[in-house]
A protein has these predicted regions:
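Class I S-adenosyl-L-methionine-dependent methyltransferase catalytic core
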Residues: 1-172
């Protein structure tokens, strides 16, 4: 009932809302790793290599200002280059868009960019609110259903009141 819906780019959203202590989850169009992959069509303007470079600079700035950023992407050499300053975990995933069931397995990464100028305090294990069950999971292209527990684990030591999925489409 108190929701605010803005139609802004991720840069405009960050400029308007990001503040020290925030947890920011980013699920941008992935860097293509296969011959037939083309995830830049998710937006009208496209999302190209230069956009990924700008996004990585934004993640570094957010971390420097005291935000904790969790970012997902494909397991691509470019991701390791762009986010070399941060921890990167590889996660086995399923793809439902390949006509060949044997080729539906993949690997994504979770980039963990903690706040750089804040003391980290463990407040205990995070429990997902019951509200999350009210939303259907996305069972399409970029579903993060299989990553929710890893994301919850990665953020369990941080206290926050809200989460913004800047590249929404995950259903949570």
């Amino acid at each position: 009932q108190d929701a605010i819906i803005d139609n802004l780019s991720y840069k405009e959203t960050i400029k308007k809302y990001a503040k020290t202590g925030d947890l920011i989850f980013m699920d941008p169009p992935y860097i293509p790793v296969g011959k037939y992959e083309d995830f830049k069509r998710y937006t009208k303007e496209g999302f190209y290599e230069e956009d990924h470079i700008e996004l990585s600079e934004c993640v570094k700035e957010l971390s420097d200002m005291g935000c904790h950023v969790i970012l997902t992407n494909s397991n691509s050499p470019m991701v390791y280059k762009l986010y070399a300053d941060f921890d990167i975990s590889v996660i086995q995933t399923k793809r439902f868009v390949n006509s060949n069931a044997k080729k539906r397995n993949g690997e994504d990464v979770i980039v963990n960019a903690p706040p750089r100028y804040r003391k980290i305090v463990n407040y205990g294990k995070a429990v997902l609110p019951k509200q999350n069950k009210s939303f259907p999971s996305t069972r399409y292209m970029g579903s993060k259903q299989s990553l929710l527990q890893q994301i919850a684990n990665a953020t369990s030591s941080y206290k926050f009141d809200s989460v913004v999925d800047l590249f929404s489409g995950s259903g949570v």
